[in-house]
């Protein structure tokens, strides 16, 4: 499981797994941002894991699915650019490498045209404590 803290919630009399995932971002200019996801998981009849998630800066609902060690989902956010905002879509592919590391390739698009791409690495547990905390000012 590449996600964080789990709990179970009741929805229409049915138990649904809920996951809380906290992402901490540190940008090159020193700005910090945190996104806290609340994600609900269901499983389709054919065994595909379906996910719906919300975070404060996400427009609407993020939706995705997982099969094996691969996870895909998409969501919209308003990116702050100077004094204005640009609504873009993120399409994330996340691959669980082992119990501690996941790689996320996110493509950013506007009107269906790719305008950017970012690759993130999620590290947790013992490996995270060995390499952390990360200090971008040392680069």
Where are these regions (language model features)?
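Central antiparallel beta-sheet cores of small beta-barrel/beta-sandwich binding domains
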Residues: 1-81
């Amino acid at each position: 499981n590449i996600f964080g803290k789990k709990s179970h919630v009741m929805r229409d009399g049915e138990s649904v797994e809920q996951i809380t995932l906290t992402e901490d971002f540190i940008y090159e200019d020193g700005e910090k941002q945190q996104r806290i996801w609340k994600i609900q998981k269901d499983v389709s009849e054919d065994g595909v894991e379906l996910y719906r998630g919300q975070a404060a800066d996400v427009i609407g609902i993020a939706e995705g699915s997982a099969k094996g060690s691969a996870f895909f989902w998409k969501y919209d956010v308003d990116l702050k650019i100077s004094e204005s905002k640009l609504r873009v879509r993120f399409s994330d592919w996340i691959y669980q490498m082992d119990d501690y590391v996941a790689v996320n390739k996110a493509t950013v698009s506007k009107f269906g045209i790719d305008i950017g791409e970012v690759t993130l690495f999620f590290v947790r547990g013992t490996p995270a404590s060995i390499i952390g905390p990360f200090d971008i000012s040392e680069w």
